[in-house]
Amino acid sequence: MPIVRFFQHIIDLFVTLILWFYFLFGYLFILVFLYIPAYVFAENRTTAFQNLNHVHLKCFFALTRLLIPRTKFKIPKDVREIRSSIVICNHLSYLDPLLLVSLFQRQRTIVKHTFFQVPIFGWFLNNYGYISSGSGDMIGPAMINNLEAIKEHLASGGILFVFPEGTRSRDGNLLPFNKGVFTIARYCNAPLKLIFIKDTNKLFPPGHFLFNTRNFNEIQLELIGSLEPDYKGNNFSISAVADQARNLFEAKIAKIKSKETEKPSQVYRQK
């Protein structure tokens, strides 16, 4: 009924405004009371900022669970306990990086260069130790500095999470992989953890402003593979490792699609 849909959209709008108000203005509030003291007094400013960002987004998702009870989160222990690794994920929604920051206290990632140019937000990204994808940051001395910083970060227990697709998938299918993350992994001699993200796009779809508060949904994160390549081996190939990672993601997607096609046929047989 139109009147029912109208009120459903009003609820979506109300919840969305609350969540984004907390997300945006929470940064400004924390800036005054926590970030500035950390900036001035913290021994390791980057670590302090990552911890604060982690707490801020952990609260964001606690608020999300409270306001959208029809959405559940299934995040197993083996995902939460990942340390000293490069985490590779598929990408479905703007919520994906926020969710990962809320899970991992020590995290870095690679962010589109344009976000670093946004006032205030870009300042936060720099102080989190996040890395710009701009060409100037991926060549010469800047690249070496970034790689050394990542290597030290991983050695101290942190994680680097990356979406090798580079953008959100609109249909759930895997987009082409950028192989740069595998080059970083070789430089840092780091293990690769493959996390499959499911159904964040149902809560906050690409191209939409509103959260979907009406549908029952379960957001899942699953560790679908752990790779520890022999980076110094004579037969090591970045392309081969990238293909191996991609194959694991594609196998997971195929398995999900197979289950989804089985459900209608099972219902039909029951009738």
Which role does the model predict for each range below?
Residues 121-122, 172-236:
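A cross-family acyltransferase "interaction/gating" segment
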Residues 153-182:
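Catalytic-site beta-strand/loop segments enriched in glycine and acidic/polar residues
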Residues 66-74, 143-144, 204-207:
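Short gly/ser/thr-rich secondary-structure transition/capping motifs
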Residues 214-271:
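Long, non-transmembrane cytosolic or organellar matrix-exposed soluble domains/tails
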